[in-house]
From Swiss-Prot:
Protein name: Cytochrome P450 4A12B
Protein's organism: Mus musculus
Pathway involvement of the protein, from the record: Lipid metabolism; fatty acid metabolism
Keyword Endoplasmic reticulum: yes
Pfam families (UniProt xref): p450 (PF00067)
PANTHER family: CYTOCHROME P450 4A11-RELATED (PTHR24291:SF39), CYTOCHROME P450 FAMILY 4 (PTHR24291)
CDD domains the UniProt entry points to: CYP4B-like
Chief localisation class: endoplasmic reticulum
Annotated tissue distribution: Expressed in lung, but almost undetectable in the kidneys of five different strains.
Catalytic reaction equation(s): an organic molecule + reduced [NADPH--hemoprotein reductase] + O2 = an alcohol + oxidized [NADPH--hemoprotein reductase] + H2O + H(+); dodecanoate + reduced [NADPH--hemoprotein reductase] + O2 = 11-hydroxydodecanoate + oxidized [NADPH--hemoprotein reductase] + H2O + H(+); dodecanoate + reduced [NADPH--hemoprotein reductase] + O2 = 12-hydroxydodecanoate + oxidized [NADPH--hemoprotein reductase] + H2O + H(+); (5Z,8Z,11Z,14Z)-eicosatetraenoate + reduced [NADPH--hemoprotein reductase] + O2 = 18-hydroxy-(5Z,8Z,11Z,14Z)-eicosatetraenoate + oxidized [NADPH--hemoprotein reductase] + H2O + H(+)
GO biological process per UniProt: omega-hydroxylase P450 pathway
E.C. no: 1.14.14.1
Membrane topology: Peripheral membrane protein
Length: 508
């Protein structure tokens, strides 16, 4: 082709023309996205019109005060029966549910976890039992259920007691006459110690090894970062989040958590190379949690992939210690602020255990009043404040109101447990609510969720709560610190904004 021919071909004359084209395309894309969001918002408004809510801003939704969510839902319960929409921003809404009939209906269905928020947990805990849905979830649940058979749980009582005694020995050394102790961190180490020994065949004490504090801190950071991300409209995008300061912190915390679980798996695999250890394993009637995973065969005959294995370990490592730490900490606070009930529990335990040098599986069912107090504390302070579902099909509730497929439903256990139409005087600590023979709705008390997707380790957790309460009350009187009243805040588990500080008075 000649030079004259080439010169006759017209190319864009300047960079400004490129910018003009790019600007037009960007504007068209923005208009398309705006229209898309507008239509989605109109669909959401139409879908939730049967459920009144407080006034909301068209763009910012309801004003969410990050650490006042629990107080906010108590206000909603008074003004909006059974359920209420909460707009996170203009094009995202969730229906908060706090009615037992609504709970029963939703928990009896097979709706998946709400993808929008739970997906933010995947980089940390992978797609284990908490995040799985459908047939894969069912296979994993069936595979892991034997790890919580009573034959497995029985010998754990002694292990739990040993871990509690280590914590109490530390408390005796560090508490002074007039000092207070922030108990949550100590209890978290203790519950991690317990789950490591019971479920992961760990030898040694987590509580006496300083290196495990980095894992505890990583879990704390990931809890907070998850909560912050759910409420930040810009951080819904994975690319934006990865380059943000919070995204970098989350990545570092994930790496710390994964290093911990990788070491646990590696250590157990190494132990199982020893023939003597394998022989001991063959003599067991049932395998514990990690050994089930290591020897598991799925329906296709294949063992779990390393990715699936670590996801289940990460999931249960977190759920098996952080939720119970929350439960025990708040139970101790509830007993500290209700000394007459604390003393009655102590007398019951003293008559059963004497000096408390040991506690057995059979003892756990012989402390009825203590169990009533534990349940009442779990009602007021549920370890998991809420769970979410995304409706896979339309639903009609008992009162005739309905929601279409695709709506995000948040089951607020905190709201349910503080609903005055379900629990009269809900803020009053009254263990008699759980007295034998007392009647209540089957779905009015859900500290471990309900339905097919209830907490797989609920019996393990309840046993640990009983052991911790019994042994602690035999050695200490729990007293509140009136200058530092804990402020409950919703994270993945129920935490306190300012810690849980108690006076610990050693009993003679």
């Amino acid at each position: 082709m000649s030079a004259s021919a080439l010169s006759s071909i017209r190319f864009p004359g300047s960079i400004s023309e490129y910018l003009q084209v790019a600007s037009v395309l960007s504007l068209l894309l923005l208009l398309f996205k705006t229209a898309q969001l507008y239509l989605h918002r109109q669909w959401l408004l139409s879908s939730t019109q049967q459920f009144p809510s407080p006034p909301s801003h068209w763009l910012f939704g309801h004003k969410i005060l990050k650490d006042q969510d629990l107080q906010d839902i108590l206000t909603r319960i008074k003004n909006f029966p059974s359920a209420c929409p909460q707009w996170l921003w203009g094009s995202k809404v969730r229906i908060q549910v706090y009615d037992p009939d609504y709970m029963k209906l939703i928990l009896g269905r097979s709706d998946p976890k709400a993808h929008g928020s739970y997906r933010f947990l995947a980089p940390w805990i992978g797609r284990g039992l908490l995040l799985l849905d459908g047939q894969t979830w069912f296979q994993h649940r069936r595979m892991l259920t034997p790890a919580f058979h009573y034959d497995i749980l029985k010998p754990y009582t002694e292990i739990m007691a040993d871990s509690v005694h280590v914590m109490l020995d530390k408390w005796e050394q560090i508490v002074g006459q007039d000092s207070t102790l922030e108990i949550f961190q100590h209890i978290t180490l203790m519950t991690l110690d317990t789950i490591m020994k019971c479920a992961f065949s760990h030898e040694g004490s987590v509580q006496l090894d300083r290196k495990y504090k980095s894992y505890i801190q990583a879990v704390e950071d990931l809890n907070n970062l998850f909560f912050l991300r759910v409420r930040n409209i810009f951080h819904q995008n994975d690319i934006i989040y990865r380059v943000s300061s919070n995204g970098c912190l989350a990545n570092s915390a994930c790496q710390l958590a994964h290093d911990h679980t990788d070491q646990v798996i590696k250590s157990r695999r190494s132990q199982l190379q020893d023939e003597e250890e394998l022989e001991k394993l063959k003599k067991k009637r049932r395998l514990d949690f990690l050994d089930i995973l290591l020897f598991a065969r799925m329906e296709n005959g294949k063992s779990l992939s390393d990715k699936d294995l670590r996801a289940e370990v990460d999931t249960f490592m977190f759920e098996g210690h952080d939720t119970t730490a929350s439960g025990i900490s708040w139970i101790f606070y509830a007993l500290a602020t209700n000394p007459e009930h604390q003393q009655r529990c102590r007398k019951e335990i003293q008559s059963l255990l004497g000096d408390g040098a040991s506690i057995t599986w059979n003892d756990l069912d012989k402390m009825p009043y203590t169990t009533m107090c534990i349940k009442e504390a779990l009602r007021i302070y549920p370890p998991v404040p809420s769970v979410s579902r995304e409706l896979s099909s339309p639903v009609t509730f008992p009162d005739g109101r309905s929601l279409p497929k695709g709506i995000h439903v948040m089951l607020s256990f905190y709201g349910l447990h503080h609903n005055p139409t379900v629990w009269p005087n809900p803020e009053v600590f009254d263990p008699s609510r759980f007295a034998p023979g007392s009647s209540r709705h089957s779905h009015s008390f859900l500290p471990f969720s309900g339905g097919a997707r209830n907490c797989i380790g609920k019996q393990f957790a309840m046993n640990e709560l009983k052991v911790a309460v019994a042994l602690t009350l035999l050695r200490f009187e729990l007293l509140p610190d009136p200058t530092r009243v804990p402020i409950p805040i919703p994270r993945i588990v129920l935490k306190s904004k300012n810690g849980i500080h108690l006076h610990l008075k050693k009993l003679q």
